[in-house]
Amino acid sequence: MNIETLFPLDPNVKVRTRFAPSPTGYLHVGGARTALSSWLYAKHFNGEFVLRIEDTDLERSTPEATAAILEGMEWLNLAWEHGPYYQTKRFDRYNQVIDQMIEQGLAYRCYCSKERLENLRHEQEANKEKPRYDRHCLAHHDQPTDAPHVVRFKNPQEGSVVFDDAVRGRIEISNSELDDLIIRRTDGSPTYNFCVVVDDWDMGITHVVRGEDHINNTPRQINILKALGAPIPTYAHVSMINGDDGQKLSKRHGAVSVMQYRDDGYLPEALINYLVRLGWGHGDQEIFSREEMIELFDIHSVSKSASAFNTDKLQWLNQHYMRSLPAEHVAKYLAWHMNDQAIDTSSGPALEEIIPVLSERAKTLKELAAASRYFYQEFDGYDEKAAAKNFKAEAVAPLAKLLEKLTALTDWSVEAIHDAMNATAADLEIGMGKVGMPFRLAVTGSGQSPSMDITAKLVGRERTLARIQKAIEFIQAQA
């Protein structure tokens, strides 16, 4: 039987991995961790990474889910050399191989009715036998080929399947445990396990990195590969991810979709760094650049145990990357959140200017965007607790004096604003807090903000002066 390559298989490429999601939902963090592991392993060996969309489940697969998977992969910057390939576009190839297998006695048509199979199962269960097909149709060829039927793979009945899992070590399954797998349904469509085998063969996949929920599929797929005379990839089955409570990660734990983390304000660098550390590490190192991940990652060092998802650790990493990445880079992602929160940034400081100022307090870009609103928009009122404390009648004098000094400035710089604040405190013989706190509330509407000399510089001269005047009038109106 001959391979049918989809792209030139470079003999110099020693490692070719793939990520093969089913488009029945969004790209979740478990899938993203698997994709990352597969991608890193390929990159470590200067290999190739293939993206394949396993959309044979026609009832559950949707174009929306496919688009979401591609969007998630692109957001994480997990670029692929080949693909995306769609299984639904390769049905002719799968059926060609199945027909050849029938001709060579590697597969056979099964005409058994649902009733017969149901009765067989009940009989086997009553006899405390493992339910499996009894090969009735292998011995009976008296049916016309156009009668309704499925096609079954003729699984070996003797011996066992042995493979060395890169994560879990040696695994052995007796062939007596395996059934004659259906590889083509009655409607003529090939089944998942068969399509995967042909794809891995045609795409020259050398290493299959996937979730532990696929372990049971592996011996079945290996037997089909052997029957085809195809090379057997190395398999690596990574463990599942649990929530903070030790239970399997699900929607009740919050975000599980990759793009939900984008929406919640996380940088892709933070999520990638966090995912690579789930079940793998390099000493005590917590922060990894992408180049370091590629250099150091080893699939053989991934833990067999389930990993617990820790949102606090992800937030810590996110804040680190918000502070340490170039502001111009972070600004590209922050712009999405500004738009999402309907903050018009056309009149105000550049996003690159506010990121270093606000990232000390915000853990996510979503929080940072919300905290930046006063740089770009007027606010309707003042924080009640802060106003009760800092907008008493005696606050009018320092605000008025500060307004006078700021109005006189010819240089609207951080240093000049800071000097004006100091001079106001000195002139009135009061502490800096008596100047700074009313000033902060007047300009930001809040009792918390970065240093006011920096804040006022970014808010701008006209807005700052107008807001101080508005605050003075507000205090006087309350008296």
Swiss-Prot record:
One of its GO terms (biological process) is glutamyl-tRNA aminoacylation. It catalyses: tRNA(Glu) + L-glutamate + ATP = L-glutamyl-tRNA(Glu) + AMP + diphosphate. Belongs to the class-I aminoacyl-tRNA synthetase family. Glutamate--tRNA ligase type 1 subfamily. Monomer. The keyword Ligase applies. It is found in: Cytoplasm. PROSITE patterns: AA_TRNA_LIGASE_I (PS00178). Its EC number is 6.1.1.17. ATP binds at K251. Disulfide bonds: none annotated. It comes from Actinobacillus pleuropneumoniae serotype 5b (strain L20). One of its GO terms (cellular component) is cytosol. A motif ('HIGH' region) lies at residues 21-31. CDD domains: GluRS_core. This is Glutamate--tRNA ligase. HAMAP family: Glu_tRNA_synth_type1 (MF_00022). Gene3D superfamilies: 1.10.10.350, HUPs (3.40.50.620). Catalyzes the attachment of glutamate to tRNA(Glu) in a two-step reaction: glutamate is first activated by ATP to form Glu-AMP and then transferred to the acceptor end of tRNA(Glu). Coiled coil: none annotated. Keywords: Aminoacyl-tRNA synthetase, ATP-binding, Cytoplasm, Ligase, Nucleotide-binding, Protein biosynthesis. One of its GO terms (molecular function) is ATP binding. A motif ('KMSKS' region) lies at residues 248-252.
